[in-house]
């Protein structure tokens, strides 16, 4: 599925399309983002499946920047299952044989004990590349990401799914997000939430 000129998404990768996906990743055919979904329990399992089962060359797997792992989890004493992100792994580029044996996998986030914790973000190569492309630093980029997370979380909580309204809110919130991200305030997430609450109240009245 191509989303305009900025994104290419290939779902349920399990056959010959794997080579096409990784070739698109390697040359950046979609311009900005190339995404694929595949059955695998984590970064290691994904590597094994892509390289050994689907026949993608190991060198081509390096085109992957990040592996996001999801799982269906069941709470103790409950039959209900919820789908959660359980791991975010960056794929380094300085390995020759396998990323598992040469420290090629860098954990950026992991879900354990009902808590999702992040780590190694300031040393992330992919975040440094993104920050460089946006002419900023990793710390400011992380503030942008956090403010963006606040935005999407609050809209999800209020079940705002109308695209017109979503774009209006995003247009109004973006300048505020930019200002907050560039500031040195420590409570930037709380500030973003407060400012977005004000905007949402104006739409509710």
What does each of the following model-derived ranges do?
Residues 5, 12, 17, 23, ...:
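Glutamate identity and glutamate-enriched acidic tracts
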Residues 144-205:
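Terminal-proximal interaction/regulatory segments of ATP-powered molecular machines
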Residues 66-156:
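Conserved P-loop NTPase
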Residues 22, 47, 61, 105, ...:
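Phenylalanine-focused residue identity feature
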Residues 32-40, 58-64, 80-103, 184-193:
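Short, Lys/Arg-enriched charge-dense amphipathic segments
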Residues 45-61, 66-68, 76-82, 178-205:
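A hydrophobic alpha-helix/topogenic segment detector
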